UniProtKB/Swiss-Prot annotation:
Domain Phosphagen kinase N-terminal: residue ranges: 45-131
Organism (species): Homo sapiens (Human)
Protein name (Swiss-Prot/TrEMBL): Creatine kinase U-type, mitochondrial
Subcellular location per the Swiss-Prot or TrEMBL entry: Mitochondrion inner membrane
Residue ranges annotated for the Phosphagen kinase C-terminal domain, each copy included: 158-400
Residues engaged in binding ATP: 161-165, 224, 269, 325, 353-358, 368
Reported function: Reversibly catalyzes the transfer of phosphate between ATP and various phosphogens (e.g. creatine phosphate). Creatine kinase isoenzymes play a central role in energy transduction in tissues with large, fluctuating energy demands, such as skeletal muscle, heart, brain and spermatozoa.
Biological process according to GO: phosphocreatine biosynthetic process
Subunit structure: Exists as an octamer composed of four MTCK homodimers.
Modified residue annotations for Phosphothreonine: T213, T355
Boundaries of the annotated transit peptide in chain numbering: 1-39
Domain of life: Eukaryota
Transmembrane segments: none
Gene symbol of the encoding locus: CKMT1A
Length: 417
């Protein structure tokens, strides 16, 4: 169980104020940090919102599409209970206009309350990014029953590896763009303590980045087990690389088939992976491991951030809901050269990345293919969508090998909840 001062550090903001009443002026000054927030607010009042509104005329991201001068004026002086502001939410999207053909989200959350305090901007961004899901009227569903999956065994002449991942955030602690060093270390302590309770094929150990040699780190990165220091401007502009590698690390079981990343883009990333095409087995391990991790977290007096509108709360709005990305490394040397490939992926609600993941190129016709959506569909629905979609891509590749024509599939319809 977390100690009294640790729980004080991570209490929900409303409770934190009450708890601090008897904690002394030093603790109050350290934990609440009111002066910088007040000073920033006073500086903004010297100028009207119109003078502070960012120049977004050349931007191609979801934030820029929905942040009108009126919305900015309405939200710019608001803060969450921990002091997170609208300008901090949008700074990464202001600094990174985006690619003409790739529309990014362009904003991040600093804590759980961000999505409520700045809902006038986040809700339309979420609706655009998640295929029409309206968080004002719809509810998200969770389903981790792997027995519902149909098929799930890919032809391994095409599929090289299978993987399912998600993220989870510890309630009461700021998200990575906003967390202090103490909060980040508290996330690590809470998570590692819980993971020590995993048994059987899930049992393993934790490795701190700060205690690894460069050779050990690089080997884990090359094997696609470990995250590297963020270099993407989208992440660095959001403040997610601060104090690197303090309180970051990886936990994995003995077989390296179940992994937890700690304090990368989110508090945790939970990953099930293996070589080959047995997606059903990967998802079964994922569901079993994730349920056990949540049980161990709750057993120690903590819980994950979640609500019925947005599902599981994570740093980037693109990962809300399930936070789930089910993907494969797949060889598509012919289909990838076909002009219809992007439209096929779009209609199947799939996205492609390079062989090494986001911001990398494809090598030898090998792509990382995964689900595009996270919110509004359950985990089971998304994994089944990937299974059906990847099988369609394999069928297209086979047809092209035989010199036959392929067709663009009917678009996947978004299920309303």
């Amino acid at each position: 169980m977390a100690g009294p001062f640790s729980r004080l550090l991570s209490a929900r903001p409303g409770l934190r104020l009450l708890a601090l009443a008897g904690a002394g002026s030093l603790a109050a000054g350290f934990l609440l940090r009111p002066e910088p927030v007040r000073a920033a607010s006073e500086r903004r009042r010297l100028y009207p919102p119109s003078a502070e509104y960012p120049d977004l005329r050349k931007h191609n991201n979801c934030m820029a599409s929905h942040l009108t001068p009126a919305v900015y004026a309405r939200l710019c002086d608001k803060t969450t209970p921990t002091g997170w502001t609208l300008d901090q939410c949008i700074q990464t999207g202001v600094d990174n206009p985006g690619h003409p053909f790739i529309k990014t989200v362009g904003m991040v959350a600093g804590d759980e309350e961000t999505y409520e305090v700045f809902a006038d901007l986040f809700d339309p961004v979420i609706q655009e990014r998640h295929n029409g899901y309206d968080p004002r009227t719809m509810k998200h569903t969770t389903d981790l029953d792997a027995s519902k999956i149909r098929s799930g065994y890919f032809d391994e002449r095409y599929v090289l590896s299978s993987r399912v991942r998600t993220g989870r955030s510890i309630r009461g602690l700021s998200l990575p763009p906003a967390c202090t060093r103490a909060e980040r270390r508290e996330v690590e302590r809470v998570v590692v303590d819980a993971l020590s309770g995993l048994k059987g094929d899930l049992a393993g150990r934790y490795y701190r980045l700060s205690e690894m040699t460069e050779a050990e780190q690089q080997q884990l990165i090359d094997d696609h087990f470990l995250f590297d220091k963020p270099v993407s401007p989208l992440l660095t502009a959001a403040g997610m690389a601060r104090d690197w590698p303090d309180a970051r690390g990886i936990w994995h079981n003995n077989e390296k088939s179940f992994l937890i990343w700690v304090n990368e883009e989110d508090h945790t990333r939970v990953i099930s992976m293996e070589k080959g095409g047995n997606m059903k087995r990967v998802f079964e391990r994922f569901c079993r491991g994730l349920k056990e991790v949540e049980r161990l977290i709750q057993e120690r007096g903590w819980e994950f951030m979640w609500n019925e509108r947005l599902g599981y709360i994570l740093t980037c709005p693109s990962n809300l809901g399930t936070g789930l990305r089910a993907g494969v490394h797949i060889k598509l040397p012919l289909l990838s050269k076909d002009s219809r490939f992007p439209k096929i992926l779009e209609n199947l609600r799939l996205q492609k990345r390079g062989t090494g993941g986001v911001d990398t190129a494809a090598t030898g016709g090998v792509f990382d293919i995964s689900n595009l959506d996270r919110l509004g569909k359950s985990e089971v629905e998304l994994v089944q969508l990937v299974i059906d979609g990847v099988n369609y891509l394999i069928d297209c590749e086979r047809r092209l090998e035989r010199g036959q024509d392929i067709r663009i599939p009917t678009p996947v319809i978004h299920t309303k909840h």
